[in-house]
């Protein structure tokens, strides 16, 4: 590793720690030439995950979009931001574990709804009503009946 102060190539690692839930390593280094200390981070480079939208357009996966949708669905509900961030991470992990480079937006929506159903039923219905574009009250009622039936099981 090259020293950012004197550009010497010889450095030694003083300390290494896992960070970001083990997805990165933080290393404290010291230059062998000028004794300057600096920090580096090492992480696995992930290939981009492409989302195929309903109309056929493609864009890079953005977990912030999922988080924004979850926050909106959970407004005035007893759900913490931490829980929503965990859902977002879980969704991304599940998508990456599929081992494919392109994923349909429908699949993402279904995974998000399954995760949200376990956290808060009201937030689930809010998210589902937007995601599935409920056209009338009957569709809404059918979704509620489905939730109640699954709770009884």
From Swiss-Prot:
Keywords: ATP-binding, DNA-binding, Metal-binding, Nucleotide-binding, Repressor, Transcription, Transcription regulation, Zinc, Zinc-finger. PROSITE patterns: ATP_CONE. The keyword RNA-binding does not apply. Its cofactor is Zn(2+). A zinc finger (unnamed) spans 3-34. Negatively regulates transcription of bacterial ribonucleotide reductase nrd genes and operons by binding to NrdR-boxes. This is Transcriptional repressor NrdR. It comes from Bacillus mycoides (strain KBAB4) (Bacillus weihenstephanensis).
């Amino acid at each position: 590793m090259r020293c950012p102060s004197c550009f010497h190539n010889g450095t030694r690692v003083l300390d290494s720690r896992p960070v970001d839930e083990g997805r990165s390593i933080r290393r404290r280094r010291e230059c062998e030439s000028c004794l300057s200390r600096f920090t580096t981070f090492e992480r696995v480079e992930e290939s981009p995950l492409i989302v195929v939208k309903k109309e056929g357009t493609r864009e890079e996966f953005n977990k912030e979009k999922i988080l924004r949708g979850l926050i909106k669905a959970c407004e005035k509900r007893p759900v913490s931001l931490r829980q929503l961030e965990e859902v977002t991470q879980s969704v991304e992990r599940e998508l990456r574990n599929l081992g494919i480079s392109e994923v349909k937006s429908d699949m993402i929506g279904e995974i998000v709804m399954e995760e949200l159903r376990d956290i808060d039923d009201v937030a689930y219905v809010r998210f589902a009503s937007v995601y599935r574009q409920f056209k009338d009250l009957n569709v809404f009622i059918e979704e509620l009946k489905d939730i109640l039936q699954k709770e009884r099981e």
